[in-house]
From Swiss-Prot:
Ca(2+) 1 binds at D13, N15, D17, K19, E24. This is Polcalcin Phl p 7. The keyword Ribosomal protein does not apply. Residues 1-35, 35-70 form the EF-hand domain. It comes from Phleum pratense. May be involved in the regulation of pollen-tube growth. PROSITE patterns: EF_HAND_1, EF_HAND_2. The gene is P7. SMART domains: EFh. Keywords: Allergen, Calcium, Metal-binding, Repeat. It holds the Pfam family EF-hand_7. Specifically expressed in pollen.
């Protein structure tokens, strides 16, 4: 599962800067299906625990560990 999380993080982090921006999260979630701007904002607020406007790898791992069922579904797509 750790390899899957790293692979998914890198797919979401399209510019390779080591963090996922709001626009990168939006693009990734669109791949998974229709997601409203409000849903993306809520998800970003939930995952971005330090409030810097980006999801770093540690925040991503924490979210994955708290939502294993969701991450299994995401791993199938990415």
């Amino acid at each position: 599962m750790a390899d899957d999380m790293e692979r998914i993080f890198k797919r979401f982090d399209t510019n390779g800067d080591g963090k996922i921006s709001l626009s990168e999260l939006t693009d990734a979630l669109r791949t998974l299906g229709s997601t409203s701007a409000d849903e993306v904002q809520r998800m970003m607020a939930e995952i971005d625990t330090d409030g810097d406007g980006f999801i770093d790898f540690n925040e991503f791992i924490s979210f994955c560990n708290a939502n294993p069922g969701l991450m299994k579904d995401v791993a199938k797509v990415f």
